[in-house]
């Protein structure tokens, strides 16, 4: 969650994620945006890890699972446009998931996302990052969404429930 990460730490993370017997998707955010000198671009990632690298939403098909995982990245520390703007998952009978960094009902510079955009997205589930507190499972329209929070607080201003969602 920052641009000043030791390469050894990133390599250890890549090895750990490579040991997970499942696909892993990463949507870089405002503190770790994707760029040519980011830890994401400068690291050899295992085949099971996909890092979203553009502000445009892209989809990755998971053959045999009837599922598409969509996502996008911050490529600069600020984004005043909703990453969901103009997105609609195709109504094709598949499960459509998305990983994004953004601020639900936010008005600021960190990917503001309106609840109406979530409801209109056609997604099955939207996995969000940015808010370091657990939101619990929420629903907008037919789309479930959640912030898991961070695994542990990074300061005394980040107390309360923490965790991950699997």
Please provide the spans of the model-predicted regions.
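His/Asp/Glu-rich metal-coordinating catalytic cores
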Residues: 3-162
């Amino acid at each position: 969650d920052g641009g000043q990460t030791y390469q050894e730490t990133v390599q250890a993370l890549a090895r750990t994620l490579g040991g997970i017997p499942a696909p892993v998707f990463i949507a870089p955010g405002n503190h770790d945006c994707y760029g040519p000198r980011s830890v994401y671009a400068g690291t050899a990632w295992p085949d099971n890890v996909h890092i979203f690298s553009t502000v445009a939403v892209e989809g990755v098909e998971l053959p045999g699972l009837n599922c598409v995982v969509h996502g996008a990245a911050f490529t600069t520390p600020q984004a005043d446009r909703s990453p969901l703007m103009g997105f609609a998952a195709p109504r094709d009978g598949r499960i459509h998931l998305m990983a994004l960094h953004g601020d639900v009902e936010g008005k600021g510079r960190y990917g503001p996302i309106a609840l109406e955009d979530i409801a209109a997205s056609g997604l099955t589930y939207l996995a969000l990052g940015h808010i370091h507190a657990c939101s619990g499972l929420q629903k907008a329209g037919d789309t479930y969404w959640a912030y898991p929070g961070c695994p542990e607080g990074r300061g005394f201003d980040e107390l309360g429930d923490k965790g991950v969602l699997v």
